Amino acid sequence: EKTPVAYTNVSKQEMEVRLASQDIPMALNTTPSVYATQQGGGAGDARINVRGFNQRNVAVMINGVPQNDMENGWVYWSNWDGVGDATQSIQMQRGLSAVNLATPSIGGTMNIITDPAAMSRGGSLKQEAGSGTFLKTSFNYNTGLIADKFAFSTTLVKKTGEGIIDKAWTDAYAYYFGSSYQMNDANRFELYAIGAPQRHGQNLYKQNITTYSQELAGEIEGYDVTSNSSGEKFETEAGRTFNQNWGAVDPSYTGKQYWYMYGARTVERHDPNFLNERENFFHKPLVNLNHYLTLSDAMRLSSVLYWSGGSGGGTGTYGSVSRAPAIPDNAWYASSP
């Protein structure tokens, strides 16, 4: 396909090899001028940079529908956990484009495409297991193109795990329904419904490198070992899986955790033995109707009508927090002195 812009298309086959069960941005790490990271290791907490610009300056779309936050431009990939299993291809355009979106796209434009008509007929049931008690079950079925007119595709996902990073657990579902109808040579309609109700523990705070590995810190040229002294100097190292965003809870405590989703004010804690300082919970369903009109060999009109709701939020500290010093063979910040 000829285009005057820097453009890369990641196919379904490439995604299956690169992505596995990671967040969608991780499939683009081999694309020129693209850097993606899973950050602290929380499920869905990935971010992507294009041409040096973070995702606030990258227009991200799913089937032509913009997904950047309307307030700050950020993209919360946990809202689309499981969409990668239904994706047919990802179009990654680097640099400014002619896309008419309110989202600043100086970094580039990313369009995640789930085209039912391009899927072959068949279905699959996939079971994945990994480190950190990770377990993911995926079901997919595609009708293929029926009578050269109609196609339907569905994907259902359930994912759980305690996480490799301490207490970066996940408990998520995902659903996708897509249909396509070719009315005639000039008109095609597509209808989609996507969502991923989920909650997961987060690891968001940066740490001094000595916290993870004193040996590695000592190998870094110019590293000031005294910089680890910020009120208290850790005499032990926590290791790469360290996460300070949680604390132990007395087993006798049976209270629920505050949250807000669809009117519910409280919820059972993920684990009765600990509480996450930073936890994300959200469900952002998306329904859209696309119409593609071919006016001529050189002109096509694309129209998208969509609805996107959502409910959820995240936890965090308010006021002061008591922390215990780092003690060998004891949980970090596990209880107050």
Language-model segments: residues:
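N-terminal periplasmic "start-of-domain" segments of outer-membrane beta-barrel proteins
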Residues: 1-17, 47
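Extracytoplasmic beta-strand/coil segments of soluble accessory domains associated
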Residues: 25-66, 88
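Short sequence motifs at beta-strands and strand-loop junctions characteristic
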Residues: 40-42, 102, 130-133, 167-171, ...
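Short acidic/polar hinge/loop motifs at secondary-structure boundaries
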Residues: 47, 66-94, 113
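Structural signature of outer-membrane beta-barrel domains
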Residues: 55, 67, 115, 130-132, ...
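Extracytoplasmic loops and strand-loop junctions of Gram-negative outer membrane beta-barrel proteins
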Residues: 72-73, 92-94, 121-124, 159-162, ...
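Transmembrane beta-barrel wall of Gram-negative outer-membrane proteins
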Residues: 122, 129-160, 165-204, 211-248, ...
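Outer-membrane beta-barrel transmembrane strands
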Residues: 271-316
